[in-house]
From Swiss-Prot:
Mg(2+) binds at D340, D346, E349, D350. It is found in: Cytoplasm. This is Phenylalanine--tRNA ligase beta subunit. It comes from the Bacteria. The gene is pheT. Residues 287-362 form the B5 domain. HAMAP family: Phe_tRNA_synth_beta2. It comes from Borrelia garinii subsp. bavariensis (strain ATCC BAA-2496 / DSM 23469 / PBi). PROSITE patterns: B5. Keywords: Aminoacyl-tRNA synthetase, ATP-binding, Cytoplasm, Ligase, Magnesium, Metal-binding, Nucleotide-binding, Protein biosynthesis.
């Protein structure tokens, strides 16, 4: 969850009233934020937010705006927003190459002037940029933001799909690199190039003098894209793959700049190929949010109160939300900087917060229900007890791992495995489809402990299943491993027979074709003709892959199928 540090004096100046740290802590509660401390040396307040629905609160200006509105009921208005059929005068243009529709289609921007940036303001802007791009922007994939000194930029700006060999000097360096070299050598390229590197061409922002402004969403130009203390005229752009998310991010930033004291000058984005949009140009910041209908009866039914329409509207006003009635229906108008009203329930939540959480008293439930464990959980607990009773030690593993451990070392193919599309590290690239690799990896680092080793886990596995709605199926499996000089197929067969005897389940065995077993020493487990698992002696080839030099036998069964058959 987002954590921010803001200067207390800047924050209180924007609210227009002084508060103690305890009072600030209490003011933060309605907005799902916690006071996490005050550093007297730096003068900063530390705040942690408990959800990501309100990115407009992640700056000192946005948070102060909401608290000020909550306390005094004054809804701020921003007259620089364009609306459908009412475009404001624009002061620059961004021309979008039609090839960008398949790469990173959306870019919107504005100009800001009239205030000299000081060091604290610059620090706050950079922090907010990082929080917005990392959390709301999903590590720049969904949304990324750039800020520049507009005095160095000649409009119109072109947003083009460029050759990977195009060169410029990236921010923080003093030599030219190609876009491909930036991906491979620059710290930001190494961190974020996964977003665009699979395309034949890369996004590039050029001004009218053909100077590189930035390589979004990776890095700005060192010549143009470096914002400094003392700058007074700025250009701000947001790129993204989601139309509404990109517009909202720009709207939030524009409102923040305005609240700081800047004048906001709109910029027009021109799409040469609208690729399905119902417009060819858009003047931004642009108000796109839709009104949401609410019913007074539904509000009171969910909250358990008896609020009047007037009281409801007053509570919404404290949250910065306008409302009106027309044709016996009630509607809210989302603020310029919010787009989290997806349903009437979201409106009711704001009414509740505006009314104050202390206004609602706990009530005993009117319906009596009895909770109990699911059949799967009861069965799993019984299995755990049986395994421990037979001398096995329970293990708990991570559900994610590497291709090397899950596939290559096991001598199997990857057709049923789920792969993470943009893993942070190859060690967590796949979702496990079996627990056996985890058990073998534990065994590979346990040779110093006395034999025999007997370990097990009851845990989740996930498989690719194109017939399922989500494309995957998740199961609970039981797997165990036995290792030692005397461990053989007969030993594990005895344990398997004992386990199913106490589970009161009849099984039939047939020879397994699994490639990680020794040929002829592996068995599939059938219940009423259905394959529910297997067991056997691990082949020397697989043992060698894991660095194990003592015989191992393993067992794995699908508990979901056992429950359905029991």
């Amino acid at each position: 969850m987002p954590k921010v540090e803001i200067y207390k004096n800047l924050f209180l100046d924007k609210i227009g009233k002084n508060f103690t740290n305890l009072e600030i802590s209490e003011l933060l509660e309605p907005f799902k934020a916690e006071f996490d401390g005050f550093d007297e040396n730096s003068g900063k307040i530390k705040i942690e937010f408990n959800d990501t629905n309100r990115p407009d609160l992640w700056s000192y200006t946005g948070l102060a705006r909401q608290i000020k509105t909550y306390l005094f009921g004054e809804i701020p208005y921003y007259d620089f927003f364009s609306k459908k059929g009412d475009f404001k005068k624009c002061y620059g243009e961004i021309l979008v190459d039609n090839k960008m529709s398949q790469i990173r289609p959306f870019i919107f921007g504005f100009l800001a002037k009239g205030l000299i940036i000081n060091d604290r303001m610059l620090e706050a802007l950079i922090q907010f940029q990082e929080k917005l791009c990392q959390s709301y922007g999903q590590k720049r994939r969904r949304v990324a933001m750039g800020m520049y000194n507009s005095n160095f930029i000649k409009f119109p700006i072109s947003y083009v799909a460029s050759s990977p060999n195009h060169k410029f000097v990236p921010l923080g360096m003093d030599c030219e690199l190609s876009l491909l070299e930036i991906n491979e050598k620059h710290p930001k390229g190494l961190e974020y190039s996964y977003i665009v590197k699979n395309f034949d061409k890369y996004p590039l922002l050029l001004d009218n003098n053909n100077n590189v402004v930035s390589y979004p969403p990776i890095i700005n130009s060192n010549n143009i894209g470096s914002l400094k203390v003392g700058d007074t005229e700025l250009f701000v752009e947001v790129t993204g793959i989601d139309f509404e998310a990109t517009l909202l991010a720009l709207s939030i930033v524009a409102c923040d700049f305005y609240d700081m004291g800047f004048e906001i000058l709109p910029v027009k984005t021109v799409f040469k190929d609208p690729f399905g949009l119902d417009f060819e140009e858009l003047v931004c910041p642009y108000y796109f949010q839709e009104e949401v209908e609410f019913d007074v009866k539904n509000v009171n039914r969910l909250l358990g109160n008896n609020l009047t329409l007037e009281r409801i509207c007053l509570n919404l006003k404290k949250m910065g939300v306008s409302s009106y009635s027309r044709d016996f229906k009630n509607y809210i108008v989302p603020p310029f900087y919010r787009n989290d009203f997806l349903h009437e329930v979201d409106v009711i939540e704001d009414v509740m917060i505006g009314e104050g959480l202390a206004s609602f008293y706990p009530e005993l439930p009117k319906a009596f229900t009895i909770g109990r464990l699911s059949a799967l959980e009861e069965f799993s607990r019984n299995v755990r007890n049986l395994m421990m009773g037979m001398g096995f030690q329970e293990m708990i593993y991570n559900y994610m791992g590497s291709r090397k451990d899950f596939i290559d070392r096991m001598n199997i193919n990857d057709q049923n495995f789920l792969k993470v599309s943009n893993p942070m590290t190859e060690n967590y690239e796949y979702i496990r489809a079996s627990i056996i690799p985890n058990l073998l990896k534990s065994e590979s680092v346990s040779s110093n402990f006395p034999y025999p080793h007997k370990i097990f886990e009851v845990g989740k596995v996930a498989l690719k299943n194109l017939d399922a709605a989500e494309g995957t199926s998740t199961f609970t499996n039981l797997a165990f491993l036995m290792s030692g000089k005397e461990i053989s197929f007969n030993e594990i067969n005895s344990i398997v027979a004992t386990l199913f005897y106490y589970l009161n389940i009849e099984i039939i065995l047939r020879e397994s074709k699994a490639t990680f077993y020794i040929n002829g020493r592996g068995a599939d487990i059938l219940i009423e003709g259905f394959n529910v698992g297997s067991f056997g002696e691990i082949s020397p080839y697989v043992l060698n892959n894991f660095g194990i030099f003592i015989p191992c036998s393993v067992f794995e069964v699908n508990i979901n199928k056992l429950v359905s058959q029991s």
